[in-house]
């Protein structure tokens, strides 16, 4: 007799081996139809896999995020089969699930979006056929023989440990895969091809160029329709287009992947950093600055020279190797070592807006989201073990304040100890419990990623959610046991002995360039008044009032507003239209009446106009709005 324990504690008995699918049908036929896979004693497997001993099961359904990932994995196989049906000489490589869909890298002649209709037609045939996904196992030798005509697959197989290797069949199509998969191709309800691009095999420019075919899939057509609508909205908000339209930044081939910020872009940049500095000063941080280029010996000590050199820009100066920093951390360690520290000095909270450079292949560069030169808002907190919980909680509270100012929601993920680590069991236990206790005290829900921490410490990843519901991983709170050891950091304890400090490395904006790109799309270029590059523009109706227009601009600039003026020989309607296209929050029209009365006609971005506003009344409304960083439009 086999006892199967369900999530609610109920036990289902079976006379012999039973599949997860049969157990699900025992609950109800309707429930079984919505099941995608099953966890048996924590191990994810196909519904068809026999359960041969007593076990606890958890069913993965179409309503679970994990269920969607499994179905998209199966969709990648469906797409791959369609490609081979249409292009028999194509060679499949890898096809992982990614955020919002999947892709498959294929060695084949170039294709374009013009080929998508016939590929999707073939895909739909495979879906309608409801072909079962069948898992089979081979020895390593058998797998190598099976794929002897596909050098990409044999390369992957050769790197696997000896033992059984799984493949999945759907009709006459077979692919190398760990699984699991949905029961049959019919559960891939809607599959749409999204785009195609070139990609080097394993990201190596010396290896063959492949066709990377992207797709997405959902359990019903409504979800697909909503997703496509979201993509259309995202296109309108594309920060690359808005960056040009709003005159914020540009890129030039003379410095690929390194943004040039224009005057308006720098106003936005400075407003963002002024807020960062204000909040960090209140939270007890000092601001530091370290050199952009440092000697090879530092990078050897930090481990970057050995592990990260291919991503670093290096130079030979007077027979010494130097590298432009890809990270701010090692410089922060040197700063700590410039003084002797007592336990009474701790915690030390030191932040840096540091410019870093990382070599990225030209093919992966993408606006402000993926660049070669960017600034990180790194901070290092040095403390005793007893301070971990309070310091983590302090960072979480700072994160809450700052993200909420931008109207960004977020969720937290705690990543715990992986298999290979440095540090003792006791250090890891104290560190992890400190992070966990701080998360519990914060009152926010969080997800645990078991074994997903770095080798040098557990971490908290912070994923923000923008106005379109997209998530972005920006902030990180990383407990680091590696660099304090490598740089021999110490403090003198109450016992008058030297001790190793605990160090937290954290970022909130992350890459500031990337964060700006996210904000541009989050706000669709319509920044709140406090953040807007230009907060108000004076629009002169004619040359006769140019003097008054300049006087208004000067008075408002003196009060601290970021101002522009439009004295062009254009109609007032064109000036208003241009200001609206530039998404300037406040448009101040001045003509003969306004000059005579010493007033303004104030137009807001929502099209409302208020006449007869004095400059003092204008400032009484606007300044508190800016000082409190109010996200709403000003009401006059």
Curated annotation (Swiss-Prot):
PROSITE patterns listed in its UniProt record: AA_TRNA_LIGASE_II, TGS
Cofactor requirement: Zn(2+)
Cofactor binding, note field: Binds 1 zinc ion per subunit.
Major localization class: cytoplasm
UniProt: Zn(2+) binding residues: 329, 380, 505
Keywords: Aminoacyl-tRNA synthetase, ATP-binding, Cytoplasm, Ligase, Metal-binding, Nucleotide-binding, Protein biosynthesis, RNA-binding, tRNA-binding, Zinc
UniProt-listed Pfam families: HGTP_anticodon, TGS, tRNA-synt_2b, tRNA_SAD
GO cellular component: cytoplasm
Catalytic, as annotated region: 238-528
Reactions accelerated catalytically: tRNA(Thr) + L-threonine + ATP = L-threonyl-tRNA(Thr) + AMP + diphosphate + H(+)
Record keyword Ligase present: yes
Domain of life assignment: Bacteria
UniProt cross-references to InterPro entries, sorted A to Z: aa-tRNA-synt_IIb, aa-tRNA-synth_II, aa-tRNA-synth_II/BPL/LPL, Anticodon-bd, Anticodon-bd_dom_sf, Beta-grasp_dom_sf, TGS, TGS-like
Compartment(s): Cytoplasm
Family of this protein: Belongs to the class-II aminoacyl-tRNA synthetase family.
Primary role: Catalyzes the attachment of threonine to tRNA(Thr) in a two-step reaction: L-threonine is first activated by ATP to form Thr-AMP and then transferred to the acceptor end of tRNA(Thr). Also edits incorrectly charged L-seryl-tRNA(Thr).
Subunit structure: Homodimer.
Protein name according to UniProt: Threonine--tRNA ligase
Organism: Desulfatibacillum aliphaticivorans
Gene name tied to this protein: thrS
């Amino acid at each position: 007799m086999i006892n199967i324990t369900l999530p609610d504690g109920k036990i289902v008995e079976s006379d012999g081996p039973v599949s997860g699918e049969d157990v699900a049908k025992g609950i109800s036929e309707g429930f079984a139809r919505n099941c995608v896979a099953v966890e048996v004693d924590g191990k994810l497997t196909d519904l068809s896999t026999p359960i041969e001993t007593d076990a606890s099961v958890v069913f993965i359904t179409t309503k679970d995020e994990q269920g969607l990932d499994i179905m998209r994995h199966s969709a990648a196989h469906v797409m791959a089969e369609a490609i081979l049906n249409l292009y028999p000489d194509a060679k499949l490589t890898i096809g992982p699930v990614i955020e919002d869909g999947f892709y498959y890298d294929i060695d084949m002649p170039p294709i374009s979006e013009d080929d998508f209709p016939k590929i999707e037609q073939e895909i739909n045939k495979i879906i309608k056929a409801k072909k079962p996904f069948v898992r089979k196992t081979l020895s390593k030798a058998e797998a190598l023989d099976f794929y002897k005509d596909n050098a990409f697959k044999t390369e992957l197989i050769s790197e696997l440990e000896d033992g059984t290797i799984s493949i999945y069949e759907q009709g006459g199509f077979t692919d190398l895969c760990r699984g699991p998969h949905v029961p049959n191709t019919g559960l891939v309800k809607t599959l749409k091809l999204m785009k195609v691009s070139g990609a080097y095999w394993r990201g190596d420019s010396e290896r063959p160029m492949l066709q990377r075919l992207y797709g997405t899939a959902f359990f019903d057509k409504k979800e697909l329709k909503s997703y496509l609508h979201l993509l259309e909205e995202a296109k309108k908000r594309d920060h690359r287009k808005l960056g040009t339209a709003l005159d914020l930044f540009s890129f030039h081939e003379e410095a690929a992947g390194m943004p040039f910020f224009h005057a308006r872009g720098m106003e936005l940049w400075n407003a963002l950093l002024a807020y960062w500095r204000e909040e960090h000063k209140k939270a007890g941080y000092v601001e530091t600055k370290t050199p952009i280029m440092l000697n090879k010996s530092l990078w050897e000590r930090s481990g970057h020279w050995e592990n990260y050199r291919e991503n670093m820009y290096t130079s030979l100066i007077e027979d010494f190797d130097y590298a432009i920093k890809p990270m701010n951390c090692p410089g922060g360690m040197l700063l700590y070592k410039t003084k002797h520290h007592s336990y009474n000095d701790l915690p030390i909270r030191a932040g840096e807006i540091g410019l870093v450079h990382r070599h990225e292949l030209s093919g992966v560069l993408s606006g402000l989201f993926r660049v070669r030169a960017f600034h990180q808002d790194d901070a290092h907190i040095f403390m005793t073990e007893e301070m971990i919980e309070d310091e983590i909680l302090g960072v979480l509270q700072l994160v809450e304040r700052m993200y909420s100012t931008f109207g960004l929601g977020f969720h937290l993920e705690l990543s715990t100890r992986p298999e290979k680590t440095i540090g003792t069991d006791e250090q890891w236990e104290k560190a992890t419990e400190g992070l966990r206790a701080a998360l519990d005290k914060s009152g926010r829900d969080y997800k645990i990623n078991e074994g997903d921490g770095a080798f040098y410490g557990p971490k908290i990843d912070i994923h923000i959610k923008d106005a379109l519901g997209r998530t972005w991983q920006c902030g990180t709170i990383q407990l680091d046991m590696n660099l304090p050891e490598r740089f021999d950091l110490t403090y003198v304890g109450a016992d008058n002995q030297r001790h190793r400090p605990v160090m937290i490395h954290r970022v909130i904006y992350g890459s500031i360039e990337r964060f700006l790109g996210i904000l541009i799309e989050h706000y669709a270029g319509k920044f709140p008044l406090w953040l807007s590059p230009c907060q108000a523009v004076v629009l002169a109706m004619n040359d006769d009032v140019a003097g008054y227009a300049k006087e208004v601009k000067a008075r408002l600039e003196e009060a601290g507003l970021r101002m522009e003026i439009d004295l062009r020989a254009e109609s007032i309607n064109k000036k208003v239209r241009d200001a609206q296209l530039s998404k300037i929050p406040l448009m101040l029209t001045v003509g003969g009446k306004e000059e005579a009365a010493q007033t303004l006609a104030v137009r807001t971005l929502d099209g409302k106009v208020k006449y007869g506003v004095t400059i003092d009344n204008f400032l009484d409304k606007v300044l508190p709005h800016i000082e409190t960083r109010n996200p709403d439009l000003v009401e006059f």
